[in-house]
């Protein structure tokens, strides 16, 4: 169907698209979880915020599972190296995610303020920790992860969890948190009225400012303060052996792709200006356009990171030759071909039933809605 090089590039694009859809869909329900203590002051208001995503949060989790499955199937070496290096971080994410279904399902079981406050805290933790950790992980990819391959292609991680928490990755974690809060704030603009609507408007404005500042600072930091990786020689159609290439580490090299192809600047421009356009849209009473702009922001930021790294997927800070690229970290050509056929069949189906569910369950959440559906809503 396609040659090996083309298949590898297609799967790089597909994983990027899956990450974007995850940050849009799961991003807004994690965003409302982070905003819960800021925009809701009593139990009715908290129930309105929670039920604004009550019909969708479980379906949104599919994209996280799909992203993990695609990473495992298409980039097994990346999966192995990442889970070796980020093991503690991934366990932290999984443990925090456990709070989300429990909080949604058990919060309303007992009409007790302390009980509900406990599960509200669990929902905040389960919504705040994953985006921060994912952002920190992406930040470490740009710095390089301390791992190496032996001549037998066994991966060895040579760092510790605390080494991941340096200033640049923490900045990326803050950027990721701002992105989901912005998406969640715009969602509340679409789904609520009254005081929650007004408070989420202010939260959206502040999140947009945070995203713009963090994104600008991260870009400048990459340009002047972080050495980038350059692929000097590798066969894009060759076997998936990470030791069969030449790699150099040079100052400012992460900007090379944008210098060589100026048209790619469209992605960082989207990442920087779309938060501003989001705020302009919601203050003009057009939250639908605001949600679109926030979604384009996710697209711009994520693909800016991907293009910056390209063709690297997981650089190594201790053994540059061990760095993983999309040319040497993939499954076999047959595996990629079979998976591509499966994705082309089932991904549109998933998208269609997801959009259908949003269409059928659309409508603003109000106090009257809670009263009419007292026994059905969270």
Swiss-Prot record:
Coiled-coil region list: none
Spell out the disulfide connections. none
Q: Which cofactor does it need?
A: heme
Please tell me the species this chain comes from.
Escherichia coli (strain K12)
Give the highest taxon in the source lineage: Bacteria
Q: How does it sit in the membrane?
A: Multi-pass membrane protein
Keywords of the record, alphabetical order, are: Cell inner membrane, Cell membrane, Electron transport, Heme, Iron, Membrane, Metal-binding, Translocase, Transmembrane, Transmembrane helix, Transport
Q: By which gene is this protein encoded?
A: appB
Q: What happens when the gene is disrupted?
A: 3-fold decreased ubiquinone levels but no change in redox levels of the ubiquinone pool (in aerobically grown minimal medium with glucose).
Q: How does it assemble?
A: Heterodimer of subunits I and II.
Q: What transmembrane ranges does the database entry give?
A: 9-28, 80-99, 123-142, 165-184, 206-225, 262-281, 292-311, 336-355
> How is this protein's activity controlled?
Inhibited by cyanide; is more sensitive to cyanide than cytochrome bd-I oxidase.
Main localisation, per the record? membrane
Q: Which family does it belong to?
A: Belongs to the cytochrome ubiquinol oxidase subunit 2 family.
Pathways per UniProt: Energy metabolism; oxidative phosphorylation
How is this protein named in the record? Answer: Cytochrome bd-II ubiquinol oxidase subunit 2
Q: Name one GO molecular function term.
A: metal ion binding
Query: What Gene Ontology cellular-component terms does the record carry?
Result: cytochrome complex; plasma membrane
Reaction catalysed by this enzyme:
2 a ubiquinol + O2 + n H(+)(in) = 2 a ubiquinone + 2 H2O + n H(+)(out)
Periplasmic side residue ranges read 29-79, 143-164, 226-261, 312-335
Please spell out the taxonomic lineage of the organism that makes this protein: Bacteria, Pseudomonadati, Pseudomonadota, Gammaproteobacteria, Enterobacterales
What's the stated role of this polypeptide? A terminal oxidase that catalyzes quinol-dependent, Na(+)-independent oxygen uptake. Prefers menadiol over other quinols although ubiquinol was not tested. Generates a proton motive force using protons and electrons from opposite sides of the membrane to generate H(2)O, transferring 1 proton/electron.
Intervals, Cytoplasmic compartment: 1-8, 100-122, 185-205, 282-291, 356-378
Q: Which InterPro entries match?
A: Cyt-d_oxidase_su2 (IPR003317)
- What GO biological process, any one, is recorded here? aerobic electron transport chain
Q: How is the cofactor bound?
A: May bind up to 3 heme groups per complex.
User: What turns on this gene?
Assistant: Induced when bacterial cultures reach stationary phase; synthesis is triggered by phosphate starvation or a shift from aerobic to anaerobic conditions.
């Amino acid at each position: 169907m396609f040659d090996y090089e083309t298949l590898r590039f297609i799967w790089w694009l597909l994983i990027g698209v899956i990450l974007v859809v995850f940050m849009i869909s799961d991003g807004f329900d994690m965003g409302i979880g982070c905003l819960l203590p800021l925009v809701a002051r009593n139990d009715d208001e908290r129930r309105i915020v929670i039920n604004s995503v009550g019909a969708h949060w479980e379906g949104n989790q599919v994209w996280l599972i799909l992203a993990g499955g695609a990473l495992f199937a298409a980039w097994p070496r990346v999966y192995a190296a990442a889970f070796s290096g980020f093991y503690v971080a991934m366990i932290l994410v999984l443990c925090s995610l456990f709070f989300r279904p429990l909080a949604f399902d058990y919060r309303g079981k007992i009409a007790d303020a302390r009980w509900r406050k406990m599960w509200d805290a669990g929902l905040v933790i389960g919504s705040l920790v994953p985006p921060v950790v994912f952002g920190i992980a992406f930040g470490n990819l740009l710095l390089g992860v301390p791992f190496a391959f032996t001549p037998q292609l066994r991966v060895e991680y040579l760092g510790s969890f605390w080494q991941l928490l340096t200033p640049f990755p923490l900045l990326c974690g803050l950027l990721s948190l701002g992105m989901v809060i912005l998406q969640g704030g715009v969602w509340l603009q679409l789904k609520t009225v009254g005081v929650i609507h007004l408070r989420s408007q202010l939260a959206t404005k502040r999140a947009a400012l945070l995203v713009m500042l963090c994104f600008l600072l991260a870009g400048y930091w990459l340009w002047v303060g972080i050495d980038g990786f350059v692929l000097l020689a590798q066969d894009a159609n060759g076997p998936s052996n990470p030791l069969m290439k030449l790699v150099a580490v040079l100052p400012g090299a992460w900007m090379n792709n944008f210098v060589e192809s100026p048209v790619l600047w469209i992605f960082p421009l989207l990442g920087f200006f779309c938060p501003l356009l989001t705020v302009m849209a919601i203050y003009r009473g057009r939250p639908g356009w605001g949600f679109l702009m926030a979604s384009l922001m996710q697209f711009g930021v994520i693909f800016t990171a991907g293009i910056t790294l390209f063709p690297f997927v997981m650089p190594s800070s201790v053994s540059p030759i061990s760095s993983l690229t999309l040319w040497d970290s993939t499954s076999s050509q047959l595996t990629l071909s079979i998976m591509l056929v499966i994705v082309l069949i089932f991904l549109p189906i998933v998208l269609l039933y997801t959009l259908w569910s949003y269409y059928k369950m659309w409508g603003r959440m109000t106090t009257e809605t809670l009263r009419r559906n007292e026994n059905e809503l969270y």
